[in-house]
Amino acid sequence: MDVLSPGQGNNTTSPPAPFETGGNTTGISDVTFSYQVITSLLLGTLIFCAVLGNACVVAAIALERSLQNVANYLIGSLAVTDLMVSVLVLPMAALYQVLNKWTLGQVTCDLFIALDVLCCTSSILHLCAIALDRYWAITDPIDYVNKRTPRRAAALISLTWLIGFLISIPPMLGWRTPEDRSDPDACTISKDHGYTIYSTFGAFYIPLLLMLVLYGRIFRAARFRIRKTVKKVEKTGADTHHGASPAPQPKKSVNGESGSRNWRLGVESKAGGGLCANGAVRQGDDGAALEVIEVHRVGNSKEHLPLPSEAGPTPCAPASFERKNERNAEAKRKMALARERKTVKTLGIIMGTFILCWLPFFIVALVLPFCESSCHMPTLLGAIINWLGYSNSLLNPVIYAYFNKDFQNAFKKIIKCKFCRQ
């Protein structure tokens, strides 16, 4: 999507397609050789990195079984969409930028604009689909496990492409102005005011509002759970300080034996005294001591279950046990707060990158068609805004995949050709 067509008039395009600059624009129609070389190197590097990054994400999901789940299907579809932007749209946009004029003819121009709008809009809407999937997963985790199916992912993906088609096709069906094709050296999308509002709101402003609402609620839900964990830990620590050991909690183990159950007593009776061993015993409501047993279940999981003990009442935990639990409670509290900070950072990166890349373009896309005679857009600024939007297709795989440890392991396998050996 070109925000400003090189060296042209102050006519705009709707997102995400080329703009033209008007007579008030500062720029040159005849570019220098050094400009062409430098621009070619910069844009060529951006395109190469975008193709490589998105192709690696697609390959990782296709080759690594552990990555083949509904959440990653959406990320994989996003990578395919950004790969289409990188292969089908960016080369023509780069040529347009380097030559400072459109040289591929009107038919190719129409195809370029349609692909530009379709792929960039679908890419943005994929980010909404991922946000919606994450919102359902964190706010309704129990029920959504059964609803989170490949069919639902396919429906979300299909919806993103359908909306993209509904936004990209109208100019080809006549929703444009007579001036849109008046200059053979320029390639611009419809400057019709109605289409400008329709396309900018459908492709960006409504998705932006939806993402802000969804990620805002995701953050609130995550913060609520984290702080609930902190309060629970602090309450457990307070109970321990007053003489009662905390109730045993379920924990996982990888030592389970398939097809059988192993029962092991976590506390053993000692003659001549009460039971007190690393917090595995607590005073029951009926005064009886509770022993902890470990249950090894099929599926490599271990659970701790309290059972009444035949021993008598248990004395309070020793001071060393209290200090240990206080330290554990403080450590868990710090971990919970660190998780909250990480959540803020992650959501900030996701929304910050999206807004930084696309907001400048869509502000220009919405405003410029309504002030053609009075608005002034420097050519260089227009090019920066334009390619800032395109760069989102390069950054998406970094944000949604490369920060994920499972994807990192798959990428290492790809680099070391482990999949080839298999």
Curated annotation (Swiss-Prot):
Motif NPxxY motif location, chain numbering: 396-400
GO biological process: adenylate cyclase-activating adrenergic receptor signaling pathway; adenylate cyclase-inhibiting serotonin receptor signaling pathway; behavioral fear response; exploration behavior; positive regulation of MAPK cascade; regulation of behavior; regulation of dopamine metabolic process; regulation of hormone secretion
Extracellular topology ranges: 1-38, 99-107, 175-193, 371-378
MF-aspect GO terms: G protein-coupled serotonin receptor activity; Gi/o-coupled serotonin receptor activity; serotonin receptor activity
Segments on the Cytoplasmic side according to the record's topology features: 60-73, 133-152, 217-346, 404-422
Alphabetized UniProt keyword annotations: Behavior, Cell membrane, Cell projection, Disulfide bond, G-protein coupled receptor, Glycoprotein, Membrane, Receptor, Transducer, Transmembrane, Transmembrane helix
Ligand binding (serotonin): D116, C120
Keyword Cell membrane (UniProt): yes
SS bond partners: C109-C187
Gene3D superfamilies named among the record's database cross-references: Rhodopsin 7-helix transmembrane proteins
Region annotated Disordered, chain positions: 1-23, 235-263
Glycosylated residue positions: N10, N11, N24
Family: Belongs to the G-protein coupled receptor 1 family. 5-hydroxytryptamine receptor subfamily. HTR1A sub-subfamily.
Role according to the record: G-protein coupled receptor for 5-hydroxytryptamine (serotonin). Also functions as a receptor for various drugs and psychoactive substances. Ligand binding causes a conformation change that triggers signaling via guanine nucleotide-binding proteins (G proteins) and modulates the activity of downstream effectors, such as adenylate cyclase.
Protein name as annotated: 5-hydroxytryptamine receptor 1A
Upper classification of the organism: Eukaryota, Metazoa, Chordata, Craniata, Vertebrata
Gene name of this polypeptide: HTR1A
